[in-house]
Amino acid sequence: MNNHKIITTFLPKQIDIRNLDIVLPVLQKSNLIVHGEIHGIKENANIVYTLVKKTCIQRLAIEASPTVFDFINSVKINSYDFSLVDEDLFDLSVLSLEMIKTIAILLQQNQLKELVFIDTFFDNLDEDAIIPPSPQEREEQLAKNILGIDGSLPTLCIMGQWHTQPKVVTDGGTR
């Protein structure tokens, strides 16, 4: 199935999430839930849809660049302008086609009041740099962007599970 057919036919659905009631006190205390997921899994969209609907989340913070915002808006108005996005993104990030469609629907329904893009690291890199950026630098930028989100709205932050592990991840000596 091609990308256009996937995004035009997909509709998110609410699913049963066991022990969802455990999350509610955390959300009430901090107004932030961080959800780690495996990139490219279409079922993630149903999880996010359910969390937003059942916990009254009003802001979504996603591990993605603001450069995808125009494409999400095109999906929101049913124009599906693929020229606005690098299609490799769909398998390599939290933004699968299904997730983008889910976000667009939640925005259409005014369920989400705000969308925040927390992965700005690659937007400002020097393409001519000889030394590649450190994975730790990106983690620091992601953390700063998350901490920069004001606590006025209940927020769901979606990131790859690699970023959400409770311990420091080492990569061949690079932290």
Model-derived features: where do they sit?
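Compositional signal for N-terminal targeting/processing segments
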Residues: 1-175
